[in-house]
C-alpha cells in the first residue's frame, strides 16, 4: 500500500471509532469552526503522508530522529516570541528539550546515507508542519473545541484528502484479513494517541508537551525488549535516562513558571 492509502484507512477506522464513542456518550460532533478543522486536517494529512514516504526511503532511526526535531523548532519559536515580547525565554524547559533530543540521538543512532538527503529534508519539513499543526491545535483549544471533535474532523477530512491522493497515485487495494487487523490496530491506537496529543497541545503547556513527547522512544524500546526480544546497548540506556531526566526537569520547570505567573497575577489584582 502507498502512503496515501495507509492514511486513508487510518483515518477511516479513527472516524468510525470516535463516532461510536461520541454517540454512546451523548456528545455531539457539530462544530462552528469548520475552517480551522480544514487547516488542521490539511497540515495533519500532509505530515502523515510525507512521514510514511520518508520512512520508506531512509533508515528508521535517522527518520525518527529528524521527526523529533519538532520540539527544537518549538523551543526556538518560544525564544523568538519571548524576545519579541520583551519577556524572559523559558530557558529551563529549552535546556530540557535539548537534553531530551540528545537522548533521542543516543537511542536512535542516526546516520545519513548518500541517497537519503532528500528524504532527510522531507523529514525536517514534516517537523515544521507538525509545529504549525500544534499551534493550530492551541488556537482551537482557545475556541473551546473538544479534543475528540478536533481528531474526528481530522480523520474525516484526512480520509477525503487521502482518498484523492490514493486515486492519483497507487490506487486502492483490497486488504486480506491479516491486513485488515493491522490497519484496524493502526487506526485505533493512532486515534487514541492523537486524542491525547491534541488535548495536551490544545489545553496544556506546548513546550512541556513537546518534551514529554520524547518518552515515546523509551516506551518503544521497552516494547521491543518485552515483545520482540530485542537487546538494548548501554548507550541506548544512557539515552533513555537523559530522556527521563529531560521530561522530569521540564515538568518541574513548567510548574515553577506557572506558580510564578499565578503569583504575579495575584499581586497585580491586589494592587489594582
Regions found by a protein language model. Give the residues of each.
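Loop-to-transmembrane-helix transition segments
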Residues: 22-52, 118-126, 166, 173-192
Amino acid at each position: 500500500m502507498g502512503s496515501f492509502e495507509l492514511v486513508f484507512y487510518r483515518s477511516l477506522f479513527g472516524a468510525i471509532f470516535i463516532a461510536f464513542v461520541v454517540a454512546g456518550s451523548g456528545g455531539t460532533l457539530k462544530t462552528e469552526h469548520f475552517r480551522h478543522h480544514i487547516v488542521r486536517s490539511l497540515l495533519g494529512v500532509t505530515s502523515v503522508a510525507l512521514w510514511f514516504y520518508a520512512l520508506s526511503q531512509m533508515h528508521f532511526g535517522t527518520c525518527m530522529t529528524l521527526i523529533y526535531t519538532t520540539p527544537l523548532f518549538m523551543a526556538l519559536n518560544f525564544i523568538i516570541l519571548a524576545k519579541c515580547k520583551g519577556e524572559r525565554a523559558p530557558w529551563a524547559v529549552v535546556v530540557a528539550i535539548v537534553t531530551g533530543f540528545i537522548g533521542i540521538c543516543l537511542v536512535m543512532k542516526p546516520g545519513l546515507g548518500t541517497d537519503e538527503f532528500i528524504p532527510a529534508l522531507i523529514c525536517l519539513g514534516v517537523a515544521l508542519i507538525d509545529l504549525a499543526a500544534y499551534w493550530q491545535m492551541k488556537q482551537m483549544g482557545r475556541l473551546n473545541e473538544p479534543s475528540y471533535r478536533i481528531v474526528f474532523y481530522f480523520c474525516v477530512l484526512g480520509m477525503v484528502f487521502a482518498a484523492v491522493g490514493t486515486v492519483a497515485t497507487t490506487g486502492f487495494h483490497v486488504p486480506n484479513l491479516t491486513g485488515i487487523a493491522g490497519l484496524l490496530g493502526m487506526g485505533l491506537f493512532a486515534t487514541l494517541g492523537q486524542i491525547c496529543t491534541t488535548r495536551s497541545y490544545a489545553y496544556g503547556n506546548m513546550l512541556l508537551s513537546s518534551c514529554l513527547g520524547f518518552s515515546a522512544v523509551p516506551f518503544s524500546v521497552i516494547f521491543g525488549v518485552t515483545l520482540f526480544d530485542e537487546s538494548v546497548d548501554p548507550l541506548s540506556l544512557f539515552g533513555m535516562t537523559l530522556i527521563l531526566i529531560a521530561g522530569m526537569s521540564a515538568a518541574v520547570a513548567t510548574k515553577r513558571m506557572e506558580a510564578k505567573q499565578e503569583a504575579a497575577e495575584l499581586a497585580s489584582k491586589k494592587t489594582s
